Amino acid sequence: VLKFLGKSIDSVTGMDLRMYYGYMREKRGIKAITMQTRLHYLSSFWDFLVTEELVRSNPVRKVGTLKLEKEIKKPFSTEEMERLRGSCLRVRDRAMIEFLYSTGVRVSEMTALNVKDIEMGKQELIVYGKGSKERRTYLTDTAKFYLKRYLKERNAQGSDPLFVTMDKPHKRMTVPGIQYMLRQLGKRAEVKKTHPHRFRRTIATDLLARGMPIEQVKEFLGHEKLDTTLIYCTIKEEQVKASHKKYA
């Protein structure tokens, strides 16, 4: 910052930092959230200097809150889902992405599940979400098919973890392990931003598009507030076009 401004540390002003912020955003293409983080660390540094009486005031405090762009987090498209399915090299991986999509569970919830938690006949299961709040969720026929195939291949018993590592001694899969597996799957399928939470967003969007009331989607996802559900769900462009054709 000092090199860019060509100033000593005790002469930097809030206006200087706003100029620095504008330059980094427009010329360097740095995201606003990244600049917010940088200014947070700079503010802590200047607070230290004020405490040590090396400078009189903290110029970062005069910058104010940066306006952050609201990033629209998109669900997987139908084509992307098919590419992901076609790129699975193992039954476990196919079972996992079908499970994530079908149930809409958080990845932390999935890693806590055991085989006995699945009521395969009813295609149901109970998960324990935030605050140990339980909710019931469901398996599609496709998810049931691949999950049964995967568990049979493993000869899995009731007390075993639902998803395990491929290497012996086949330990329970962790959140980082699942995230890594999905990143690799995304690379093979050429689908960017392939991570567990995106499957949750996708099923929520698809359920709404098919007519499920948003209050029911809220319960399905285990949200406390309806506002949270609204953030998770996006409307696909083709839906807008179809509605326009119908109502315009």
Question: How should each PLM-predicted stretch be described?
Answer:
Residues 1-248:
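Conserved catalytic core of the tyrosine transesterase superfamily
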